[in-house]
Amino acid sequence: MGSALKVLMVGNSFSLSCRSYLPDIVKSLPDCELKLEIAYIGGCSLQRHIREYETSRQDPEHRPYTDIADRPASLQEFLKRDRWDIISIQQASHCSWQPATYEPWAEKLITIIRETNPQAEIIIQQTWSYNAGDIRINTAQDEWGLDQAGMFSCLNAAYRSLARKYAFRVVPAGLAVQLTRKDSPRQLPRMDEKLKTSLVYPAPLPETDDAAGRCWYKDSDSGKILCADTIHLNRYGEYLQGCVWAGFLFKVSPESITFEPADLPDKARLAKYRSAAEQALQEYSV
């Protein structure tokens, strides 16, 4: 422990969630400093990163990403902004469980990174499976033919295969989320259109204790529920992700983290998530 790191995440909303608590967690660690930047496009797959890079190469005014401060930029600009110590990559969640979607795009992205930042260590963030209320994975008979555990099993295998191929280290955020599910926290009910159209704000809405699944969106006029987020981390999940990343980057035990956000009052849940982060870092292996 005790170091300064410059980290660039090339990803999507599953990396953007690191900005919520990771910086404050690192500030609470003795003698640790983090410069964090996130090259973000919502739902961006490895394939799309390459497509956007090529478009920006042809048209330098093409800036499809936003950074950690919500400013537009191209991937080329991100890669040249600093001499990065660590650059992370990840697959988009909706295809993370499909191994065939990783290549040749991962190899192309890795080549681009190595050409511009040969000094940087490239790592992988393992993403997570959705809240079980998501209609694509609510049961193994749904659209993807997977339930929550099945989605994690597939994405875990896909990320592990990628890591083995390139000898990359992995930030096991997805494993940490999965470990918090061992005691069967409340999942959202099946969030199909029939249920959503029956819900009217501010009537009691289904709740979840899972790390994923975070908020409701409603029509401002009728109050009818339009969408339920079943895929992104909620605030407690973002704290979990921050603990995993802090432990990984600075080689500290997440259970030793003392920072607890003022907006997260459930201290027992925070402690549980620190323990899950610790367990994930200890147990994960390629």
Where do the PLM segments sit?
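N-terminal secretory targeting modules
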Residues: M1-I38, M191, I257-V286
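Short loop/turn hinge sites at secondary-structure boundaries
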Residues: Y53-P60, K182, F250-E255
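Conserved SGNH/GDSL esterase-like catalytic core that processes O-acyl groups on lipids
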Residues: K6-L8, L16-A106, I112, P118, ...
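Extended, basic/helix-rich recognition subdomains
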Residues: K218-A276
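Alpha-helical cap/lid subdomain in secreted, periplasmic
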Residues: A73-R235, S256
